[in-house]
Swiss-Prot record:
Name of protein: Cytochrome c oxidase subunit 3
Residue ranges crossing the lipid bilayer per the database entry: 16-34, 41-66, 73-105, 129-152, 156-183, 191-223, 233-256
Keyword Transmembrane helix attributed: yes
Pfam family, one: COX3
Lineage, highest ranks first: Eukaryota, Metazoa, Chordata, Craniata, Vertebrata
Topology versus the membrane: Multi-pass membrane protein
General function of this protein: Component of the cytochrome c oxidase, the last enzyme in the mitochondrial electron transport chain which drives oxidative phosphorylation. The respiratory chain contains 3 multisubunit complexes succinate dehydrogenase (complex II, CII), ubiquinol-cytochrome c oxidoreductase (cytochrome b-c1 complex, complex III, CIII) and cytochrome c oxidase (complex IV, CIV), that cooperate to transfer electrons derived from NADH and succinate to molecular oxygen, creating an electrochemical gradient over the inner membrane that drives transmembrane transport and the ATP synthase.
Family label: Belongs to the cytochrome c oxidase subunit 3 family.
Organism the protein comes from: Litocranius walleri (Gerenuk)
Residue ranges that the UniProt entry lists as topological domain Mitochondrial intermembrane: 35-40, 106-128, 184-190, 257-261
Gene Ontology biological process terms in this record: mitochondrial electron transport, cytochrome c to oxygen; respiratory chain complex IV assembly
Disulfide pairings: none
Catalytic activity: 4 Fe(II)-[cytochrome c] + O2 + 8 H(+)(in) = 4 Fe(III)-[cytochrome c] + 2 H2O + 4 H(+)(out)
Length: 261
């Protein structure tokens, strides 16, 4: 079956799933070493091997799809189903954080002072940096849609401009979030409020960084004429992921920043 022409997704043997798993082990172990022993050596090793794995894995996929023609319509259909299932799993991942937040906030225990936010916690003003962050992400959702429509219409220059704007807005969001964390009057160790706030918004911030990386790869691929109006699943998956990140932020803003304050 693997040595004859067919439309199905028969991947070649690859070392990258193994190196990716090992790099994930190094990163998680490195985080523990950093938290408990203030040593970043293992974490840096994990991040480096993870970046190398991602680069080489993406390179192989680009070669198979763009240059060798392995991504037939049947394969693209399977990849779309896979991306949809991945996003559904991410929705469930964030559902756990929202569950923890509402479980704690709707029935605050006597230890929290019987109120929410807990006694002694001064929440961030939802009409300052969080509102700006919301505007930035909503604008990036518009620009990524503009990029997609430009690609479908064969307008390469507009697609590149819109994609660049989206990436710039994603980086701006990350910088705003970092400044907000730096200036926050509470920390992750300040009870259940600090824990749910930093874990939920922190994982969302991580997803923004991942999505920005995904879009940067798409930007450089488009510079090399890799995408056409009929063959661009890599960009389409990145756009879906970015819209997912947008929607999660809206729920975070309404729940944690606005209602939770």
């Amino acid at each position: 079956m693997t040595h004859q022409t067919h439309a199905y997704h028969m991947v070649n043997p690859s070392p990258w799933p193994l190196t990716g798993a090992l790099s994930a082990l190094l990163m998680t172990s490195g985080l523990i070493m950093w938290f408990h022993f203030n040593s970043t050596t293992l974490l840096m090793l994990g991040l480096t091997t993870n970046m190398l794995t991602m680069y080489q894995w993406w390179r192989d996929i680009i070669r198979e799809s763009t240059f060798q023609g392995h991504h037939t319509p049947n394969v693209q259909k399977g990849l779309r189903y896979g991306m949809i299932l991945f996003i559904i799993s991410e929705v469930l991942f964030f559902t756990g954080f929202f569950w923890a937040f509402y479980h704690s906030s709707l029935a605050p225990t006597p230890e929290l002072g019987g109120c929410w936010p807990p006694t002694g916690i001064h929440p961030l003003n939802p009409l300052e940096v969080p509102l700006l962050n919301t505007s930035v992400l909503l604008a990036s959702g518009v620009s990524i849609t503009w990029a997609h429509h430009s690609l479908m219409e064969g307008n390469r220059n507009h697609m590149l401009q819109a994609l660049f704007i989206t990436i710039a807005l994603g980086v701006y969001f990350t910088l705003l979030q970092a400044s907000e964390y730096y200036e926050a009057p509470f920390t992750i160790s300040d009870g259940v409020y600090g824990s749910t706030f930093f874990v939920a918004t922190g994982f969302h911030g991580l997803h923004v960084i991942i999505g920005s990386t995904f879009l940067i790869v798409c930007f450089f691929r488009q510079l090399k004429f890799h995408f056409t109006s009929s063959h661009h699943f890599g960009f389409e998956a990145a756009a879906w992921y970015w819209h997912f990140v947008d929607v999660v932020w809206l729920f975070l803003y309404v729940s944690i920043y606005w209602w939770g304050s």
